[in-house]
């Protein structure tokens, strides 16, 4: 882990970019508060557009930045500019990293305190603002800035942009929530 302010600032800048120049489709895994959900998402961070389909029931959500309209199966909702930063559903938060509560802002629960580059990925070590004994992590592709995962003791977000025959059997040692485990085939 590197705690030098210069390297941490560079890593934070790359992470906040969130792959802004890249449009992609992915599978999004969200776990927390005793629930696990999987979504098929399409995201264009630079265009500020996204759509998500919950795999368990097929319900959909999407956002149109031209009209500031959130479309859901229940109908449309026009949003104000002030509402947008905290309006991203869990399914697309990794596509828009600034929506995560990890940057040390007044409204955030965590702040980055160290970074590590391993292979093609960079991981930010996060420390809880109120309880410095609680940690989390945020991992992104170093080159593109596209987020891959966000782990805290109470929440998990993970994006899978392509299926791989072998991911090396990575074991993070814990999963957030209680009473449920990850769906079969998701590590």
Regions from the PLM with identified roles:
Residues 38-41, 60-66, 77-86, 137-140, ...:
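Short amphipathic beta-strand/extended segments with alternating polar/hydrophobic composition
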């Amino acid at each position: 882990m590197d705690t030098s302010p210069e390297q941490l600032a560079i890593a934070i800048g790359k992470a906040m970019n969130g792959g802004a120049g890249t449009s992609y489709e992915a599978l999004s895994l969200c776990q927390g508060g005793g629930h696990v959900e999987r979504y098929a998402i399409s995201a264009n961070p630079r265009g500020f557009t996204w759509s998500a389909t919950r795999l368990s029931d097929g319900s959909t959500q999407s956002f149109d930045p031209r009209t500031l309209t959130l479309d859901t199966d229940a109908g449309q909702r026009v949003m104000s500019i002030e509402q947008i930063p905290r309006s991203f559903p869990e399914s697309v938060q990794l596509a828009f990293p600034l929506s995560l509560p990890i940057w040390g802002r007044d409204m955030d629960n965590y702040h980055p305190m160290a970074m590590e580059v391993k292979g093609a990925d960079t991981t930010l070590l996060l420390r809880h603002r109120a309880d410095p004994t609680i940690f989390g992590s945020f991992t992104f592709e170093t080159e593109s800035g596209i987020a891959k995962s966000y782990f805290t003791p109470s929440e998990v977000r993970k994006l899978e942009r392509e299926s791989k025959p072998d991911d090396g059997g990575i074991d993070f040692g814990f999963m957030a929530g209680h009473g449920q485990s990850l769906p079969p085939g998701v590590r």
